[in-house]
């Protein structure tokens, strides 16, 4: 079992190999070199107007999963195309998780064919980041780091292309920086996590409560300041969709 301990640097090489091998197997063999297989596109929901239905992998007898929704959003993050709105089961709710689709679109430089690839690559990088962050944070303890990759959830998320990997990566990074007393960096990654998945706001509340108990009002102010992009995005959603519940 010593092979799995942090002292064996071989695991730092094995982790990327495992992730790359998993993606390669899925792309080449399971999905027959069709990257859209990672998004679990079903038969029921309307497809993004930026997708050619003759060139995507549609899973029969499937409604369609979150990955399909994220991909539609990645093609048109501001949801300016009417077809994008029609392809989303609940645009207001889906758009609250904008960061991963937005970054995928940005890094693809407007090339729609590249967006699915970038999306999958970002989630893959997220898995490795979680592994290496855990290694850095726990490096002075005897931990079985390679077993981090044995968590089923990360591979499920990679398979269906949702935002949990990136959200948790950002939260872990925020935690790392707060431990290093780098408060501003921590708050930045915390804000990005909340733009990735809105339920991460629970960590923001936790931070705020700790600062409130300690009467550290300066940090509360700084935390609120770093969330300006978060406020702006939600103001945009109100402008576009009005006020109301997510599930109208």
Which role fits each region the language model picked out?
Residues 1-51:
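Start-transfer (signal-anchor) and selected internal transmembrane alpha helices
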Residues 112-117, 131-153, 169:
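Transmembrane-helix signature of polytopic, membrane-embedded enzymes
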């Amino acid at each position: 079992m010593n092979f799995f301990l942090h002292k064996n640097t071989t695991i730092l090489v094995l982790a990327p190999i495992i992730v790359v091998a998993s993606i390669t197997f899925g792309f080449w063999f399971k999905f027959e070199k069709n990257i859209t297989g990672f998004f679990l596109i079903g038969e029921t929901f309307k497809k993004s107007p930026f997708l050619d239905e003759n060139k995507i992998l549609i899973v029969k007898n499937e409604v369609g999963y979150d990955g399909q929704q994220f991909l539609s959003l990645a093609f048109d993050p501001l949801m300016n195309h009417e077809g994008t709105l029609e392809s989303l089961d609940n645009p207001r709710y889906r758009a609250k998780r904008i960061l991963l689709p937005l970054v995928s679109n940005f890094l693809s430089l407007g090339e729609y064919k590249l967006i699915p690839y970038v999306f999958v690559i970002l989630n893959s990088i997220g898995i490795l980041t979680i592994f290496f962050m855990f290694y850095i944070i726990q490096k002075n303890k005897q931990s079985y780091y390679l077993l981090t990759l044995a968590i089923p959830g990360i591979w499920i998320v990679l398979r269906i292309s949702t935002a949990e990997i990136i959200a948790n990566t950002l939260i872990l990074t925020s935690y790392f920086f707060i431990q290093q007393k780098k408060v501003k960096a921590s708050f930045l990654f915390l804000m990005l996590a909340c733009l990735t998945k809105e339920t991460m706001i629970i960590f923001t509340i936790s931070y705020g409560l700790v600062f409130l108990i300690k009467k550290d009002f300066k940090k509360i102010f700084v935390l609120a300041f770093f969330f300006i992009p978060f406020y702006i995005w939600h103001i945009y959603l109100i402008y576009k969709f009005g006020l109301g519940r997510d599930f109208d």
